[in-house]
């Protein structure tokens, strides 16, 4: 059964003609352009620190792909502080954690959202060993299998500087997008996050500079990560 969504977080769904919704569509186009020479079917969205807007970004980005008619799967790989199930008003009894530990099947864990063509694999209950689950053969096999069923898979992770999970996840993805809250994150934080991802040869698609306007809506600018100091 499909349920309601968080109007504030999913502006692309509730107000697709708004200026901010158009900016999210431009972000989707930019990602497509930056990955045109290399298939980017499995994309991770992360940030250096918490509270930079990565989760709102990935939810709206996923929605733009779905509204384009792409079959999209959104994965909540933040096994420590999950949030995507709340945005889509869906249960979190089963999800990625139970799937990787053998407690459920992908068919049972993946849920439909109110957005057509957009499905969600929530995090599931917080496990005792999140890093071990992410860095497992089961995770690798799961993602390879899911790539056969979806046009686009977007993965939300914890902040890079918080835990090792996103660095591990980046090695399993075709590309990584970093969300940066301008005026909040220091250059040293961004540099350290970049170095950690580059150390494992993560393929950086670009950074999204997240700013706030008078209505507290997010505005984005995306550039090739390599152009940033």
Residue ranges and their predicted role:
Residues 1-229:
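P-loop NTP-binding module
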């Amino acid at each position: 059964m499909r349920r309601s969504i968080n109007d504030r977080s999913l502006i692309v769904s509730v107000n697709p003609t708004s200026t901010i919704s158009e900016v999210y569509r431009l972000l989707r186009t930019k990602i497509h352009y930056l990955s045109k020479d290399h298939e980017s079917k499995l994309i991770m969205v992360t940030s250096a620190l918490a509270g930079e807007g990565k989760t709102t970004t990935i939810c709206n980005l996923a929605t733009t792909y779905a509204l384009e008619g792409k079959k999209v799967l959104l994965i909540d790989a933040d096994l420590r502080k999950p949030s995507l199930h709340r945005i889509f008003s869906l249960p979190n009894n089963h999800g990625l954690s139970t799937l990787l530990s053998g407690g459920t099947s992908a068919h049972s864990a993946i849920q439909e959202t109110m957005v057509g063509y957009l499905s969600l694999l929530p995090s599931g209950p917080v496990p005792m060993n999140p890093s071990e689950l992410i860095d497992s053969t089961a995770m690798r096999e799961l993602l390879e299998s899911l790539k056969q069923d979806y046009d686009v898979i977007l993965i939300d992770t914890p902040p890079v500087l918080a835990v090792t999970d996103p660095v591990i996840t980046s090695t399993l993805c075709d590309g990584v997008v970093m969300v940066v809250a301008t005026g909040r994150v220091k250059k040293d934080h961004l540099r350290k996050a970049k170095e950690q991802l580059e150390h494992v040869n993560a393929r950086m698609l670009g950074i999204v500079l997240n700013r706030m306007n008078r209505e507290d809506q997010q505005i984005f600018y995306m550039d090739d990560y390599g152009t940033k100091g």
